[in-house]
Amino acid sequence: MGQKVNPVGLRLGINRTWDSRWFANKGEYGKLLHEDIKIREMLFKQLKQAAVSKVVIERPHKKCRVTIYSGRPGVVIGKKGADIDKLRKKVSEMTSSEVFINIVEIRKPEIDARLVAESIAQQLERRVAFRRAMKRAVQSAMRLGAEGIRINCSGRLGGAEIARLEWYREGRVPLHTLRADVDYGTATAFTTYGTCGVKVWVFKGEILEHDPMAQDKRQAEQEAGPSSRPQRRERGDRERGDRGDRDRGHRA
């Protein structure tokens, strides 16, 4: 099932947390949930050129704190903070709570799955060869510290008459391992031949803080050191022992 399910949803509560962090009574839950959906749709639409990866919404008492994770924070803030004031006014019109907006810069957008998927989708819309776009994204991610990446592109690639799926993978992407930090993102390219879907999985390493067995194993390896491990001898250096007094002649 790890191959089919959304890797982010599978790991919620294990090594990932929710993008909406608030509690509401039964009567208000639906209203606040729809507010979150509308706020996210508006922000992703308004900040299409700002490389927004995700929007986290928190609701303390009678307040609404919106945190925008962006690869280009300068585009979000605008000149002297003018654009962020406009965003705050628009969000205030959608909710009755007092609105606060925070901007967090994404240091390595090349290993953010959503931003990688959107970048490939934009290149497909500009008629860049899909293989070149996928290979370039894979190389950039591996160069900047990703332990593995997989990219799927599906649709009428290159204007072909029959839709197909093309994929590239480099490194390791363990989808069944729950302690693995796997980021997942999707995007859609609207081309003249139709839509093309892009899916990206990025493996950033294993999170071992909450796994006591993994911590004990790692600590034991560090204490033992590399020299205490038994070394395997080469095939030519093996000593052949005495094979005994076995009779090699013909049996009577």
UniProtKB/Swiss-Prot annotation:
Q: List all membrane-crossing ranges.
A: none
Q: Which GO terms describe its molecular function?
A: mRNA binding; rRNA binding; structural constituent of ribosome
- List the InterPro entries: KH_dom (IPR004087), KH_dom-like_a/b (IPR015946), KH_dom_type_2 (IPR004044), KH_sf_prok-type (IPR009019), Ribosomal_S3_C_sf (IPR036419), Ribosomal_uS3_bac-typ (IPR005704), Ribosomal_uS3_C (IPR001351), Ribosomal_uS3_CS (IPR018280)
Say yes or no: keyword rRNA-binding present. yes
> Ribosomal protein among the record's keywords?
yes
Q: Where is the composition biased (Basic and acidic residues)?
A: 212-221, 231-252
Q: Which domain of life is it from?
A: Bacteria
Which GO terms fall under biological process for this protein? translation
Among Gene3D superfamilies, the record links this protein to: 3.30.300.20, Ribosomal protein S3, C-terminal domain
GO cellular component labels: cytosolic small ribosomal subunit
Instruction: Give residue ranges for domain KH type-2.
Output: 39-107
Map out region (Disordered) in residue numbers: 212-252
User: Which Pfam families does the entry link to?
Assistant: KH_2, Ribosomal_S3_C
Any idea which UniProt keywords this protein has?
Answer: Ribonucleoprotein, Ribosomal protein, RNA-binding, rRNA-binding
Give start-end of the signal peptide.
none
Q: Which HAMAP family match?
A: Ribosomal_uS3_B
Q: Which family does it belong to?
A: Belongs to the universal ribosomal protein uS3 family.
Summary of subunit composition and partner proteins: Part of the 30S ribosomal subunit. Forms a tight complex with proteins S10 and S14.
| Known function | Binds the lower part of the 30S subunit head. Binds mRNA in the 70S ribosome, positioning it for translation.
Could you identify this protein by its name? Small ribosomal subunit protein uS3
- Source species of the chain: Xanthobacter autotrophicus (strain ATCC BAA-1158 / Py2)
